Amino acid sequence: MPAAQFDPDFTKNAFRNYLKEFYAEHSRQMKFCGNTPELFGEWKKSARQRVLELLSIDHLPVKTPEIQIINEVRYDNYTMQKIQYQTLPELVVPAYLFIPKNCSSPLPTLLCPPGHGNGINQVIEEEGAYYKYPHAFAEAGYIALVPEHISFGERSASGQSECRFDHEALNLLGSTVIGYRMWELQRSLDILESLPQVDSNRIGCAGLSLGGEMTLYLA
């Protein structure tokens, strides 16, 4: 291009503009375009399989971890146990397990994945956005399990979120941190289903922010 026609603004934005065009051409290739329940069922099956492929966790084992009880706090209507369990030989998951008292087992149960923040202790102690909601579930007669996500809270060396490094590292290794978190939550569900107090036909999931995102993936 002759010097007189050189446009520095075009050069600066050229690759971003290319990416926008590329995205417009290739985005939402799995969107649902049907109009019947039957077509939706077919789409859901293929979309679910594609999501699992993109999460890249098929190399991870499927087994129910054993839990270790660290301590227990007793409230009037329920107990709160601090527990931990191994999902891999190198990975330990701290968690809180809430069990109502004086209720007929098996009980309805909720898995409560935390959101972005300071982890499980924030969820069970903070009066703000979380409203200590696992305590409220236990008061209402639900068993509740609050597991610590990879990169947060007690699983962070700095005590702050380290998800950016873990996200980028796993991407370079051909996997995803979202996939690892979902896989660990699946193991949490396995633990709940193994407990005699739990009604395995009435297990739900409830989370805020990242916890809400992980609830969608689990569903």
For each feature predicted by the language model, list its residue ranges.
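Aromatic pocket-lining residues of Rossmann-like dinucleotide-binding sites
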Residues: 137, 218-219
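Cap/lid segment of the alpha/beta-hydrolase catalytic domain
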Residues: 105-194
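Non-catalytic accessory segments flanking enzyme active sites
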Residues: 20-98
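Glycine-rich nucleophile elbow surrounding the catalytic serine of serine-hydrolase chemistry
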Residues: 207-217
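Short, flexible loop/turn elements at secondary-structure junctions
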Residues: 85-89, 99-101, 115-117, 151, ...
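Mature N-terminal, pre-catalytic/accessory segment of carbohydrate-active enzymes
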Residues: 1-27
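Alpha/beta-hydrolase fold nucleophile elbow
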Residues: 197-209
